Amino acid sequence: MKRLTTLLILLITISFLGACSTNSSDKEKENQLIIGIDDAFAPMGFRDEDNEIVGFDIDLAKAVIEEMGKEAVFQPIDWGSKETELQSGRIDLIWNGYTVTEERKEKVLFTEPYLANSQVVAILKDSDIKSLSDLAGKSLGLQAQSSASNALNSSDIASEIKDVTEFKTNVLALQDLENGRVDAVVIDEVVIDYYMTIKPDTYKVLDESLAPELYAVGVKKDNNELLEEVQKAMDEVIANGTAAEISEKWFGENKILN
C-alpha cells in the first residue's frame, strides 16, 4: 500500500511539473514575435563572422519589439516565400528591407515606411556600361521575388535586355557579376552601398536609378491589432531618437523617415 501511495505521489508530481513547464513555455511563446528575414541581405539583416544575425533592421526590430514589451526572434526564411510564411502563421512579421508595392498590399498590411531606398544598377568598376541605355543586349542578375524585378520590368530598358538571371540572394548575384556571368545586377541601393565600402575597387553604380521605393514592416492581412502595436512602438523609437542612433551606426547618417 505504501509503495502504491508513493507511486501515485510521484506520478502526480511529474504531471504537475510537466504542466508547469508547458505553461511556462506557452507564456514564453506568447511574449515572442517571430520575424521573417533574409539572412544574406547586408546591411539590413545578415550573418557576421561569428554567424550571428546582425544588421540595421535587426537592431531596429529589437528596439521596437522591446518597446512593445516583447522579445524579437529572428527566423531566416526563403525570401521568395515570405508572404506564404506570414499567411501560414509561421512568422508574425516580415522585416528586412521589405519594399512597399501595390501587389504586396493585396497580401499583407504595412506599417508606415521608415526608410527610403532605390533600385539601382551595379556594375564592375572597369565596365564599359555608362548608362541605362547601355544595358541593351546585356545579361542582368537580380534577387528572385524581390522588388528589383518589378523595377526592371517597369523600366523603359526592360524589352532590350538580353536575359535576366534570378538568384536566391544578392550575394550570389554579385558573385556572378564578379565572375563575368552577368554584366550588371539590379539591387537595392542600401545593399550595394554596403558592399562598395567592403570592396571599393570592385563595384560602382550607374547614376540613373530604376525606381525609388520605401521600406516598411509587413503584418498578416487580418491582424490590425498587431499592426497598430508595431506602429505605435515604431513611432516611439523614432521619436526618442533610438532609430536615428541605429541608422548612424549602420549608415553613418540618419536615414530614418519622420
Describe the role of every protein-language-model region.
Residues K62, E71-D134, K204, S209:
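Acidic, polar ligand-binding/catalytic clefts
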Residues D39, A116-I123, E189, D193-M234, ...:
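Periplasmic-binding protein-like
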Residues F16-A19:
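C-terminal motif of bacterial Sec signal peptides marking the signal peptidase cleavage site
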Residues G45-E49, A61-G69, A148-F167, M196-P200:
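Ligand-binding cleft/hinge of the Venus flytrap
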Residues Y98-E106, A151-S154, D176-N179, D183-P212:
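A ligand-binding cleft/hinge motif common to bilobed small-molecule-binding domains
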Residues T22-S25, S147-T165, K204-D207, M234-N258:
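Ligand-binding clefts/hinges and TM-proximal coupling segments of bilobed small-molecule sensing domains
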Residues D26-G97:
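Extracytoplasmic small-molecule ligand-binding "clamshell" domains
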Residues I58-E67, D126, S133-D134, S139, ...:
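Extended ligand-binding regions for polar small-molecule ligands
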